[in-house]
């Protein structure tokens, strides 16, 4: 991948991850998630599940890999629910 393109993609993913992390942090502060929840790590996991699930679903031409990846990621976030 061209370095300029890589940096642009990196910025895109960082912004997306930051938005997810901010939302998860608000959930933690508001008592929706336990205090030991790590919003940054959870955001990384959600984004990885989304992107990985999307890639697998596209290559398989089947939505099931996306469903499985997101179900697992969301279940992990829910495991921190109060």
Task: Label each residue range with its predicted role.
Residues 1-21:
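Short secondary-structure transition hinges
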Residues 37-56, 72-76:
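Hydrophobic alpha-helical segments that form the core
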Residues 1-8, 34, 54, 58:
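Short amphipathic alpha-helical segments at helix-loop
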